[in-house]
């Protein structure tokens, strides 16, 4: 097991993968949208692909992140359309009427709203992004009972680490969960400031710091 892949499983991967496998319980043939294609969102997306969801729709503010998601198995992509309503409408169009599960991985209020609005009858929005304390979620209340929509919160992918770390790594070894492709940059520990800048810029997927003697010299 490569150390850089194993390092990812401790947080971002477990959060994203668990939201799909544990919180939502996505099954083959379910329609899934993932809103926010950073490390957590892409982990969720790969997990949905691994269980046979179809379509799996990637949604992000930037075309480059949507393209990265397609390279990891997304069957379609939507670039943020300027509002929650417009973005959700695009997802509903691509999915043929809405998704069974919309996984929200940004923590932004509008993205959460888009997740709810993207779901079909009896669909669920799974909120894994952590919002600011003052963030409020506004959705058409009537659609919750009328459409039997659900809103599910997920912290750390509803995971039990002693079980789920091993499951995730087993699926990685099988080739169905290409976690190594999340590592976009590998830097020595001495370049930690550059690593932080890369993450803040949005250019990186996941940056792994090498703490070995060779990596810090």
Question: What would you call each of these model-derived segments?
Answer:
Residues 1-31, 35:
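NAD(P)H dinucleotide-binding glycine-rich loop of Rossmann-like/cofactor-binding domains
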Residues 34-37, 49-114:
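Adenosine-nucleotide cofactor-binding segment
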Residues 41-42:
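N-terminal Rossmann-fold NAD(P) dinucleotide-binding loop
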Residues 45, 66, 112-116, 141, ...:
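Generic hydrophobic/aromatic pocket-lining and core-packing "Φ" positions
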Residues 92, 96, 133-185, 193-194:
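C-terminal substrate-binding/catalytic core of Rossmann-like NAD(P)-dependent dehydrogenases/reductases
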Residues 113-117, 162-217:
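C-terminal hydrophobic helical "lid"/dimerization subdomain
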Residues 123-124, 149:
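Glycine-centered, small-residue-biased loops immediately flanking beta-strands
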Residues 128-129:
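Acidic carboxylate diad motif detector
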């Amino acid at each position: 097991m490569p150390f850089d892949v194993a390092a990812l499983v401790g947080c971002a991967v477990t959060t994203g993968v668990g939201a799909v496998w544990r919180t939502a319980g996505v099954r083959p043939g379910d329609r899934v949208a993932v809103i926010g294609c950073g490390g957590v969102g892409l982990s969720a997306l790969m997990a949905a692909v691994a269980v046979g969801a179809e379509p799996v729709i990637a949604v992000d503010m930037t075309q480059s992140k949507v393209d990265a998601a397609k390279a990891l198995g997304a069957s379609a992509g939507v670039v943020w359309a300027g509002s929650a309503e417009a973005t959700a409408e695009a997802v509903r169009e691509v999915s043929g009427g809405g998704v069974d599960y919309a996984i929200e991985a940004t923590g932004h209020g509008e993205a959460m709203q888009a997740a709810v609005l993207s779901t079909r009858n009896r669909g669920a929005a799974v909120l894994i992004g952590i919002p600011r304390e003052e963030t409020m979620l506004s959705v058409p209340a009537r659609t919750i009972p009328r459409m039997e929509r659900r809103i599910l919160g997920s912290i750390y992918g509803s995971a039990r680490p002693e079980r789920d770390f091993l499951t995730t790594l087993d699926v990685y070894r099988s080739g169905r969960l290409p976690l190594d492709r999340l590592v976009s940059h590998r830097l020595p520990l001495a370049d930690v400031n550059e690593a932080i800048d890369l993450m803040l810029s949005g250019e990186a997927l996941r940056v792994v710091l090498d703490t070995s003697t060779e990596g810090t010299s």
